[in-house]
């Protein structure tokens, strides 16, 4: 069992991914030391994020144990269910993992996209009507705050698609709109809000 990852917790009112990822020498040294100890199979496992439902039944818990302890995956993506279950399973998975897991989430408009009982925000098309992009930035920070409360470190958002293709209706209200300039500005603001809030953002979809 590896020791705890040595890093200075990011204060809620002053989160900084840049400091955590680039400036903390102890963090980088810890990562290097762990990498040197991993077998080839374990290093390959670190490249994978496994999708699992946040359910408390025996079969699901056994599946969680298998992917964490046997396959030694690098991260988890919870999808659907109750917020309380995700929190409990996240804590359980982190206790089992020799290397801290990267907990990811697909929450384009926040936690409510996947989890019941969480704050509900408007779809991106509604947010695309907002002229003040500072509000989109603050929205991103709030989504990040809620993600961190659940132990989520990566949010697969925002959607950067421009809604101009009638043959691709699945995007629809998930897009900030049909203007490339407006979409780009909103994507940057939302991404910066997430990352200043301590959560990595992932713009999508490509190609």
Please annotate each region the language model reported:
Residues 1-15:
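Bacterial Sec-dependent N-terminal signal peptides
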Residues 23-56:
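Mature N-terminal segment immediately following signal peptide/propeptide cleavage
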Residues 53-61, 65-186, 203-207:
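Enzymes and membrane/adaptor proteins characterized by extended Gly/Ser/Thr/Asp/Glu-rich
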Residues 193-205:
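Phosphate/pyrophosphate-binding betaalpha-module
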